[in-house]
A protein has these predicted regions:
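N-terminal, polar/charged subdomain of small-to-medium soluble alpha/beta proteins
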Residues: 1-83, 90-119
Length: 119
């Protein structure tokens, strides 16, 4: 999912919870402020990005023993400290969830047409 609006991690976690899951692993990327950086502009080729994010979610469910996967990425002008991306992976056991989460962030950075420019 691509959005201009901020997201609540708590809300996303609550929506993902299922009785068969023993763990939900989350990765949260935020705008880092170093030196004179005031924020970040995030540009997205939306149609292609949404398609690729959905593909990544399917791949993670197939490659790893996970029950649920969700990726939410922001676009637009973001300030230091604001959320950029959240990845949630629900599974019965933590090892597969952590492996899937790491796979997803690595693949997202390589494959999804999203460009970030510090301002």
């Amino acid at each position: 999912m691509i959005t201009k609006e901020d997201f609540s991690i708590d809300d996303r976690v609550e929506k993902m919870k299922k009785p068969e899951m023993g763990v939900i692993v989350t990765f949260l990327g935020v705008v880092r402020g170093e030196g004179e950086i005031k924020g970040m502009n995030v540009e997205v080729y939306e149609k292609m990005a949404v398609d690729e994010l959905e593909k990544l979610e399917r791949e993670a469910r197939e490659k790893f023993e996970v029950e649920a996967v969700e990726i939410v990425h922001r676009e637009g002008s973001l300030k230091v400290g604001e959320n950029i991306v959240v990845i949630l992976v629900g599974a019965k056991h933590r090892k597969e969830a952590f492996r899937a989460c790491e796979y997803l962030i690595d693949e997202l950075k390589e494959r999804v047409p999203i460009w970030k420019k510090e301002v």
